[in-house]
Amino acid sequence: PLAVVVDITHHIAPQDLIQTAYIIESSHMYFPKGTIHIVVVDPGVGSERAIIALERMGHFFLAPDNGVLTLLFEAGEIGSIVRVDNPNYFLDSISQTFHGRDIFAPVGAYLSKGIELKMLGTPVDQKDLICLSIQKPFISEERELVGLIVWIDRFGNLITNIDYNSLDKFCTLDREGTPR
């Protein structure tokens, strides 16, 4: 009853893992250390896909192993990672369609009570987890900055993956495409 629940969004396009990855990567740092981030964008619910829990820079993440944490992996500084497979921390009855309720929420509650990650399941190496192939911003042969539209918000704004460093690099090119 003392937990604060912050619902970041319900506006992710259905099953859009890339959009989810960007929202997680761009929002988690605004929460205090110790925050438990539960990610339930899960096209594989009810299948044999794994659920993982990890620690990164004092934050905990609980998500399906479907690539939604790709950008966190790329950012580095990942601590412990476990495959959440200890049923002692799940509800007794697990449905095929509500793992958010039956697994993610109870495991998140146990994390909030201080249970160690290692108690939740089997250690796993980051290289064994699913990562999405997400195009990185680049400068084309035509000297154009090319990025990916990650999502279009409800106001029609295009949110891209073009970051400050990519834009800065592009803006420092002369007309011939060489750095100034």
State what each model feature region is:
Residues 176-180:
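Short conserved beta-strand and strand-loop elements enriched in small hydrophobics
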Residues 2-4, 11, 15-22, 26, ...:
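Active-site histidine-anchored catalytic micro-motif
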Residues 82, 92-174:
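Anionic-ligand-binding alpha/beta catalytic cores of soluble enzymes and soluble regulatory domains
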